[in-house]
Amino acid sequence: MGVLDHVSEMFDCSHGHKIKKRKQLQTVEIKVKMDCEGCERKVRRSVEGMKGVSSVTLEPKAHKVTVVGYVDPNKVVARMSHRTGKKVELWPYVPYDVVAHPYAAGVYDKKAPSGYVRRVDDPGVSQLARASSTEVRYTTAFSDENPAACVVM
């Protein structure tokens, strides 16, 4: 079959055509400020007409929109921003339980909804929040629970 494969490669006409990738089913979470029912309606209608959108869920108190479907997140954000004229961004928060140190300087956000903290992809921020091994040794050396602790007092 080596000869047939070689001949079929020579006369293959599909090299000029791109094969379309099928989009994956995604859940896109978006932050957009919604003050009234009119804003909610405008946000919902801006996304519902998109090709590939299965469902749209609004949480106006948290300023959160969840879009489920076969869509590109960047296209959803661009369309919503263009159609509504509002500032739109991907959901920048993660649940409080996921973060190791939720009150670190780069993570804690006063404007975040309750139960959420800001998502930080920078590994340097998490390193600043954790204590080094020498700091841990110093704090445990003077602990009341440590029987071998310093008893100067």
UniProtKB/Swiss-Prot annotation:
The modification Cysteine methyl ester is found at C150. The keyword Membrane applies. One of its GO terms (biological process) is heat acclimation. SUPFAM superfamilies: HMA, heavy metal-associated domain. One of its GO terms (cellular component) is plasmodesma. It is found in: Nucleus membrane; Cell membrane. GO terms for molecular function: cadmium ion binding; copper ion binding; lead ion binding. Changing C39G: In HIPP26-4; loss of interaction with HB29. A lipid is attached at C150 (S-farnesyl cysteine). Residues 151-153 form a propeptide. Induction: Up-regulated by cadmium and zinc, but not by lead or copper. Up-regulated by cold, drought and salt stress. Not induced by abscisic acid or by leaf senescence. Disruption phenotype: No visible phenotype. Inhibition of HB29-dependent induction of stress-related target genes. Expressed in roots, stems and flowers. Lower expression in siliques and leaves. Expressed in the vascular tissues. Detected in lateral roots, shoot apical meristem, petals of unopened flowers and weak expression in leaf vasculature. Interacts with ZHD11/HB29 and ACBP2 (via ankyrin repeats). May also interact with HB21. Belongs to the HIPP family. Heavy-metal-binding protein. Binds lead, cadmium and copper. May be involved in heavy-metal transport. May be involved in cadmium transport and play a role in cadmium detoxification. This is Heavy metal-associated isoprenylated plant protein 26. It comes from Arabidopsis thaliana (Mouse-ear cress). The gene is HIPP26.
